[in-house]
Amino acid sequence: METKEKNTATPYDLDGKPPLKLAIPLGLQHVLAMFVGNLTPLLIITGVCGIESGSELQVALLQNAMLIAGIVTLIQIYTIGPVGGKLPIVMGTSSGFIGVCRSVAVTMGSGVAGYGAILAASFIGGLFETVLGGFLKPLRKFFPAVVTGTVVLSIGLSLISVGIGSFGGGSTAPDYGSLENLFVGTVVLVVIIALKHGTKGFTSFSSILLGIIVGYVLVTVMAMVLPTTFTYVDETGATIEATKSWVINWSKVADASWFAIPKIMPVKWVFDAKAIVPICIMFVVTAVETVGDISGITEGGLGREATDKELSGGVMCDGRGSSLAAVFGVLPNTSFSQNVGLVAMNKVVNRYSIGIGGIFLIACGLFPKLAALISIMPQSVLGGAAVMMFSSIVISGIQLITKWPLSPRNVTIVSVALGVGYGLGSNSAVLAQLPESINLIFGGSGIVPAALFAIILNIILPKDEKTEVEMAEEILAEKKKMESK
């Protein structure tokens, strides 16, 4: 009888096993929603660290990123001891770390050693977040929606400039900002918007992936009809001939093997306090973000608040997963807000269905040709998708902030935290006279100061006379009163 109940479960049941004909497409739907976002941070940071596009190392890292996302997703869904929230949450490489990782890479010399420092710091930071997750219950009161929303919003704002940089072909490319790069990025962005809002079902929730495929086709056709090289004068006055940044090198896909066992420790770790301190602070920030995502899943998909056990297990999974990711040369893992939004939209909360998506990600991590195909993506194609992805993070933050009425207290928290955070992120030169350690922590992306100010202001500002719930109830009552008239 129990088996029958499990087999007749629906996608809207948290537990049980729906028929595979339903579970497989629903699981793949979640993979498609996060596939590009899972690999984008790695493409950006490896570029900053001077790891060649399409190189054997970058392909191995992308391969591992897919593998780790699948493994950590399964841990989050089914748990190992206290680790995991036992909720339908998809895990993947965190975009929130892009800013601080870029700062660390530049400080360490923008080479492979910089990437090694990021990995060592991520391993330690993951252990730190795991411990933080174990003590989350007494700390939960410090992370209301106004704080988590401000953090998510600051992450989105800090990433938009990164997306625009890729949109133009990559800020280090000799042909950065060329009409061809801007044309490619614009086409990809327009296709994504058209598919997302002009279609339904598969094409709508896969709009980013399909937009990138269109970008690949577009640059391939452009390479057939337009010149693929150009000349420019470098800083020394020499005339250089170079390949345009939007041209794809298909030979790297042809050279990649069909199957390979993922490599452990593909990059040598470098332990340096200049990397460890800011990245550990960023793990506090991402813990706040994960609390918001878990709350979004339970409230949007299950119609209830998250329990302390779910929040604690979810944050601990973030930490353990990030430490595991570092062992495989991958950037920190966290819950994916895109998938939280998908669950809230379609109410599909079945863990078995989403677990199938995790298994698919693990399978993808075993095929280097797929990783090679992604590694040769032109920056302008990536930028067209990144602008959309990073902007959606901004909207997620706004939705969290406006979850309850914006009281004067909450307005102060949001405005001061964003003002200081975004201001320092966009004009870090104001900290030039301070010690390097302060610059590295607070001048990288603005996320850390925004998070710290939001948390501190939430603690020290007098509480509102009316609670958020009471204010919301008053507004609902007023609306009903107006409707009755």
Annotate each predicted stretch with a short phrase.
Residues 1-88, 96-108:
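N-terminal signal-anchor module of multipass membrane proteins
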Residues 38-39, 215-220, 224, 231-322, ...:
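Membrane-embedded hairpin module used as a gating/binding unit in multi-pass transport
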Residues 61, 82-97, 141-150, 204-210, ...:
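Short, non-helical or kinked segments that cap or interrupt transmembrane helices
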Residues 28-35, 123, 147, 178-182, ...:
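Hydrophobic alpha-helical transmembrane segments of multi-pass membrane proteins
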Residues 20, 46-86, 277-351, 476:
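Membrane-embedded helical hairpins/re-entrant loop segments and their flanking transmembrane helices
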Residues 2-7, 38-42, 46, 187-198, ...:
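Juxtamembrane interface elements at the cytosolic ends of transmembrane helices
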Residues 1-25, 228-264, 299, 304, ...:
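Intrinsically disordered, low-complexity non-transmembrane regions of multi-pass membrane transporters
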Residues 106-225, 357-471:
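Membrane-embedded alpha-helical modules
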